[in-house]
């Protein structure tokens, strides 16, 4: 069944600007200065407010803004990942000796992630990344290491998230709603001092995360899998590998994800591909044409990906040579998180029409490139969503009459 029947539906990738009230509450919760019941009341009320605003603007497929993924400051590029740390047992913070910080040099057929600081784009533009890039300044943010069997301990948190979203969307007129969750491949980017192999580490994360996936879909929501590692991991292999070696390397994570999705309804699943949401040059982004077949092999109904920013806007033409499987749909970004410029609604409409030409108007949902929360000033983020909704209405009039 096509996703669209009489118009282009709209959505976004997940993270929306946290309200000042929620940011203050998250900070207070972390330092123990707020009662838990008071915090939960604030979270519930702010989730309602962010859903109401999406519906008011004209977003059809809404979410909770990822408000359950805590941010205690306005600029935060990592809440989509960091939230998983508190929901997983078997992790430990180390003051030194974190293997994720080690520099590695890969060889043909023997690829291994190097450290984040040793990424090829980051070393090429070292002065920019050192002096200009603001990823948020959270002195308490540390990355854990797997030191024991991984277990899922986020039942209460995910239960709270789906209850808040269910209450917030009840009777509000949204088309549907989704909840974002981390992929095994991205989760396994933390250090590992327990599992003998990287494959065992990734599959351990798959066993952990499939519990969260099931809780989301059992609640009736669409599950969005966030997995930047499929695309942006390319930049973290140093030196640059062959494309074939890289695709073989990420296949383990793709297989682990499909394993975790075995009991999840495909029609309730969408997958998010991106090249990392930081405001950097992205000169080493792997071209989408190399990733398209891998993307379509993932057991999801919808595929969301960057298609509006200066590095990837031209790649809509790749879909001219791809066959979108029956029952699948695309969710291209038609406004971007990477610039403060507000996209004109006519440009948004043109971008939607480009995808409609190559995959069919019934199979396109208009979206953002990546999450907007923590990456743009809140006023700009909401203005971009307004432009997205207006552009979708323009495209709908031309495509559906």
PLM features: what roles do these ranges have?
Residues 1-401:
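Domain-level signal for soluble alpha/beta catalytic cores
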């Amino acid at each position: 069944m096509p996703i669209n029947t009489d118009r282009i539906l709209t959505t976004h990738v997940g993270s929306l600007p946290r309200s000042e009230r929620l940011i203050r509450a998250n900070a207070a919760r972390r330092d123990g200065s707020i009662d838990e019941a008071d915090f939960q009341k604030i979270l519930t009320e702010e989730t309602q407010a962010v859903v109401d605003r999406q519906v008011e603007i004209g977003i059809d497929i809404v979410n909770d803004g990822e408000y359950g993924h805590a941010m205690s400051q306005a600029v935060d590029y990592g809440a989509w990942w960091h939230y998983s740390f508190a929901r997983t047992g078997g992790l430990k913070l180390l003051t030194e000796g974190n293997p994720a910080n080690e520099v590695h040099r890969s060889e043909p057929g023997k690829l291994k992630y190097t450290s984040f600081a040793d990424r090829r784009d980051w070393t090429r533009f070292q002065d920019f990344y050192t002096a200009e890039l603001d990823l948020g300044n959270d002195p308490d943010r540390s990355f854990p290491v797997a030191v024991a069997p991984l277990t899922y301990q986020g039942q209460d948190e995910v239960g709270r998230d789906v209850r808040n979203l269910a209450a917030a969307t009840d009777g509000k007129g949204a088309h549907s709603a989704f909840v974002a969750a981390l992929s095994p491949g991205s989760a396994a980017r933390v250090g590992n001092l327990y599992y003998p192999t990287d494959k065992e580490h990734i599959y351990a994360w798959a066993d952990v995360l499939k519990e969260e996936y099931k809780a989301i879909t059992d609640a009736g929501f669409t599950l969005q899998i966030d997995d930047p590692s499929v695309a942006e991991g390319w930049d973290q292999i140093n030196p640059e590998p062959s494309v074939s070696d890289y695709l073989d390397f990420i296949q383990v994570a793709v297989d682990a994800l499909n394993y975790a999705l075995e009991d999840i309804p495909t029609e309730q699943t969408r997958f998010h591909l991106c090249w990392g949401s930081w405001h950097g040059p992205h000169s080493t982004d792997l071209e989408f044409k190399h990733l398209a077949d891998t993307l379509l092999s993932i057991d999801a109904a919808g595929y969301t990906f960057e298609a509006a920013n200066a590095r990837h806007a031209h790649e809509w033409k790749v879909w001219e040579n791809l066959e979108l499987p029956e029952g699948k749909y695309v969710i291209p970004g038609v406004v971007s998180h990477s610039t403060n410029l507000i996209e004109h609604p006519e440009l948004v409409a043109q971008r939607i029409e480009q995808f409609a030409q190559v995959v069919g108007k019934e199979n396109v949902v208009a979206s953002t490139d990546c999450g907007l929360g923590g990456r743009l000033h809140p006023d700009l983020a909401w203005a971009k969503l307004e432009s997205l909704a207006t552009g979708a209405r323009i495209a709908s009039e031309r495509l559906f009459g």
